[in-house]
C-alpha cells in the first residue's frame, strides 16, 4: 500500500447514516448500537447534507439553551433538530483521492473522520483510525 493509493482502498464501506428527520434519541441509539463516533446525515434522496460527531452530541448538554434538558431524551426529541447540531456540508473525499491527500486534510483540519462521496452518494468513510492501522501495518 502506498500513500498515493486511493482512499477507496482503506475506507469503511458499511456506513451507517441517519436522515435529517431522525430524532435525537434515534441518533443517540445509532451511536451506541454501532460504536461509532461520526454519523453522516442525508436528505430524502440519500445525498450527504451534514455530519454529527460524538462531540456534537456531548455539546448539546453543555449549551445554555439546552441546560434544562438534563439527560431526558423525551424532551430532547421535541426540542433538538438534528440539522441544528450537525456540521452542514462537511468536507468530503472522493474514492479516487489519495491516502496522502486525506492525511493532509486530517492534519490541517484536525478532523477524525471524513465521508467518501461519489456522485453525491456516500460510498464510505475514512477515519484517522484507518490511517493509524495502515501505518502500523506497513511500518
Where are these regions (language model features)?
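Tandem CBS (Bateman) regulatory domains
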Residues: 1-14, 54-91, 98-99, 103-107, ...
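Short, flexible active-site loop motifs that bind/organize anionic cofactors or intermediates
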Residues: 14-17, 47, 92, 121-122
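Residue-level signal for alpha-helical context at structural boundaries
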Residues: 25, 45, 49, 75-76, ...
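A glycine-centered beta-loop-beta connector
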Residues: 31, 39-56, 106, 114-130
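The conserved cystathionine-beta-synthase
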Residues: 18-35, 42, 83-86, 92-110, ...
Amino acid at each position: 500500500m502506498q500513500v498515493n493509493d486511493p482512499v477507496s482502498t482503506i475506507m469503511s464501506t458499511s456506513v451507517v447514516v441517519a436522515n435529517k428527520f431522525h430524532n435525537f434519541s434515534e441518533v443517540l441509539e445509532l451511536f451506541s448500537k454501532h460504536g461509532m463516533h461520526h454519523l453522516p446525515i442525508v436528505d430524502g434522496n440519500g445525498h450527504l447534507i451534514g455530519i454529527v460527531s460524538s462531540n456534537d452530541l456531548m455539546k448539546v448538554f453543555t449549551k445554555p439553551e439546552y441546560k434544562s434538558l438534563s439527560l431526558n431524551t423525551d424532551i430532547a426529541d421535541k426540542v433538538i433538530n438534528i440539522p441544528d447540531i450537525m456540521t452542514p456540508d462537511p468536507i468530503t473525499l472522493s474514492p479516487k483521492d489519495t491516502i496522502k491527500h486525506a492525511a493532509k486534510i486530517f492534519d490541517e483540519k484536525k478532523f477524525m473522520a471524513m465521508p467518501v462521496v461519489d456522485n453525491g452518494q456516500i460510498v464510505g468513510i475514512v477515519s484517522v483510525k484507518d490511517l493509524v492501522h495502515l501505518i502500523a501495518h506497513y511500518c
